[in-house]
Curated annotation (Swiss-Prot):
Protein name: Delta(14)-sterol reductase erg24B
GO BP terms: ergosterol biosynthetic process
Gene (UniProt): erg24B
EC number(s) per entry: 1.3.1.-
Main location: endoplasmic reticulum
Knockout or disruption consequences: Results in decreased hyphal growth and virulence; as well as to hypersensitivity to azole drugs. Deletion of both erg24A and erg24B affects ergosterol biosynthesis and leads to the accumulation of the intermediate 4,4-dimethylcholesta-8,12,24-trienol.
Biological role: Delta(14)-sterol reductase; part of the third module of ergosterol biosynthesis pathway that includes the late steps of the pathway. Catalyzes the reduction of the C14=C15 double bond within 4,4,24-trimethyl ergosta-8,14,24(28)-trienolto produce 4,4-dimethylfecosterol. The third module or late pathway involves the ergosterol synthesis itself through consecutive reactions that mainly occur in the endoplasmic reticulum (ER) membrane. Firstly, the squalene synthase erg9 catalyzes the condensation of 2 farnesyl pyrophosphate moieties to form squalene, which is the precursor of all steroids.
Taxonomic lineage from the root: Eukaryota, Fungi, Dikarya, Ascomycota, Pezizomycotina
Top-level EC class: oxidoreductase
GO molecular function annotations of the record: Delta14-sterol reductase activity
Amino acid sequence: MKLRNTGQMAFRSPFSNLHVRRSSHKPSHPAFVRQNRSMHYYFRDALNIGAFGIIFGLPCLLYAFTFFCNDISGCPAPSLLHPSTLSIDKLEQEVGWPEDGIKALYDTQVTMWVLSYYLLSLLMQVFLPGTEVEGTELACGGRLKYKFNAFLSAVLILSGCAVGTYLYGTEFALWTFLWDNYVQVITANLIICTAIAIFVYLRSFSVPAPGQLNPELRQLAPGGHTGNVLYDFFIGRELNPRIKLPIPFVGETARTIDIKVWCEMRPGLLGWIILDLSNIAHQYRTYGYITDSIVLTTAFQAFYVLDALYMEPALLTTMDVIMDGFGFMLSFGDMVWVPFLYNFQTRYLSVYPSELGLSGILIVLAVTAAGYVIFRGANNQKNRFRTDPNDPRVKHLKYIETKTGSKLLISGWWGCARHINYLGDWIMSWSYCLPTGVAGYAIIESINPASGEMQKQAVQTPESRGWGMIFTYFYMIYFGVLLLHRERRDEEKCKRKYGADWNRYTSLVRSRIIPGIY
């Protein structure tokens, strides 16, 4: 595999092959940019169909997940298991569809609170101390400057959540607000991400043409200015859209917001963990206890997010920042898809509390550890060899030299498969889903013998058992497909770059991701 700097945990972007692994990348040569743009669109034959399908289809899918796996009738809603007798009226009743219809999915007050969260994150970016870093060299010449303090911002916000929970318990206003207005919070984020995507699309037409004065180092993204309006809006025309806030008494770097980097590392990632915590609070409010499964899942996800935030500067060497424009794809993915799809396992467990027990915990930990050993071992091995090939830990590794001067490892982890780190990354993703077990439940109403009041309880029935896995294991399947797509794109890029050397390399390292299988 090509030697790249992939020292941190992978950050997974929702749709494209983004956030899958950290990699250093040479600045794009103009000839390569022209070749890349004319070579193909990312969705090839399905430009408008693919873009339209994602822009309108994925938000609908997210709403469907939220309604079809619920705390009113079950997960999935019982009528979905009997399609021959399915009726819209019955389904609306089972999923809790609001009486006011689709307009009830939006609430102005909720949207204002969500905007307040975005504003808080923005102000923390500006005023909190942080590390200033230069990005990679741009094709238009020069390097952009970035200020990073996402980890500090997250620590302060989570500390505030901890104080609120200490004072008010699980009735802390933030926890009840997020659960009671969950659908409206989704809508608010969807509106915000769409508005940002429209803004950066329209603003991209003011990017200076080659040869014109360009003091802000603005440039269009390769493949993002095809002339197809819908596709360009979706994929992103401008590479690094930025705004300068009119805030006095702070440095220019501090008040300059790189919209793409800010969206990728701030509101959505931290929002994901905040939603997990609100789900834990809901479980305690409902049942009076917290299960090991929801704690374990939240711990895995929190570690993943905090690791990404702590290593925030590593984002500058990813394909996202170097090559991909910022459009609806990343805007929606970062601010809607990631937090509201990725918290689904803990949301499920908050309604159907499942105890893993010691043996279950050990199994999940063992699977996660196996994935981590593969992922971290492969990346560390590559980084050490790239930094110092004479390091005693890697000097025994075999490699081939290419005409470009790069060295491709053919032994050790990278002799097992050309993208062995993807296998470890995918196995680690299982840890989010396995704690939900064989998912599925129905909401059963019964009389509380002590109080005489009607109560609802989530019970796993033979009919519902297993069907909930469509929702709780969707992430694992989706991420696997994402990695396969990324692997194919990597293979094409490496074949173009290395030519005959890549053919020689693949003849020596035959497996792509899973040794001996694929």
